[in-house]
Amino acid sequence: LIKKIYKLKIPLIGICFGHQVIAEALGGKVEKSSRGWGVGVHRYERKLNPKWSKIVGNYFFGYASHQDQVVIKPKNAFSIYGSSFCPNSILCYDNLENPIAISIQSHPEFKKDCLEMIIKRRIGQTIPNKVGNKALDSLTEKIDNEKIFKPLLGALRVI
C-alpha cells in the first residue's frame, strides 16, 4: 500500500513506527538498536539544508520512545536530521525541497504527560531502570514539537 501511495505521489507522513514502515517499504532497513531504548528528550542535528528545515533550525529537541530504527535509509531518501543514537531521525523522499513523503522517528505529536506515563509504565519492565530514570529526568528539557510539525506538513504542501 505504501509503495502504491508513493507511486501515485500522494503526500505521506510517518511518525515513529510509520517512519520505520515507510523506510522498509521503500527499500530501507529497520533493526532493533544495539544501544537499546531511545527514550526521553533527544537532540537531533540538521544534516542537510532544504528550505523548509530553516524554520526548524540547526537542531531540535524531541520526544523519543523506540528501540527499532531505520539503520539503512532507502536510496530515494534524504536524511535531514539525526543524532548519534538515531542517525536517520527525519527522512524525506524523492525530492529534498518538495518531497512526496516525510517521516520522523521522534514523537512531535506527544505531550510531556503522555511520554512520562509511557516511561513510568515500562520502567523496570521493558525499559531498564537506569535508562528510564535518565529519560524521566530529561523531560524537564524544552522540546520543539511546535516548530517541527508545520515545516513537515508545509514541505508536503498539505498546509
Language model features: what each stretch is:
Residues 1-50:
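Cysteine-nucleophile active-site neighborhood
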